[in-house]
Amino acid sequence: MAKKLEITLTRSVIGRPQDQRATVEALGLKKLNSTVVKEETPAILGMINKVSHLLTVKEA
């Protein structure tokens, strides 16, 4: 069974490039401090890596 990751948006996307905004939205994060739980897949890990400076990630 794949691990679950708890992803929280901790920094604002205001002033960030459009590709970073799109990545945050693709993760399902809309507002500051919103949290989603996703399975650990290569695609999700790549998105997390791209915007890691905006997120906090924990194992769920």
Curated annotation (Swiss-Prot):
<dbReference type="GO" id="GO:0003735">
    <property type="term" value="F:structural constituent of ribosome"/>
</dbReference>
<dbReference type="GO" id="GO:0022625">
    <property type="term" value="C:cytosolic large ribosomal subunit"/>
</dbReference>
<dbReference type="GO" id="GO:0006412">
    <property type="term" value="P:translation"/>
</dbReference>
<keyword id="KW-0689">Ribosomal protein</keyword>
<dbReference type="Pfam" id="PF00327">
    <property type="entry name" value="Ribosomal_L30"/>
</dbReference>
<keyword id="KW-0687">Ribonucleoprotein</keyword>
<comment type="similarity">
    <text>Belongs to the universal ribosomal protein uL30 family.</text>
</comment>
<dbReference type="InterPro" id="IPR036919">
    <property type="entry name" value="Ribo_uL30_ferredoxin-like_sf"/>
</dbReference>
<protein>
    <recommendedName>
        <fullName>Large ribosomal subunit protein uL30</fullName>
    </recommendedName>
</protein>
<dbReference type="InterPro" id="IPR016082">
    <property type="entry name" value="Ribosomal_uL30_ferredoxin-like"/>
</dbReference>
<dbReference type="InterPro" id="IPR005996">
    <property type="entry name" value="Ribosomal_uL30_bac-type"/>
</dbReference>
<comment type="subunit">
    <text>Part of the 50S ribosomal subunit.</text>
</comment>
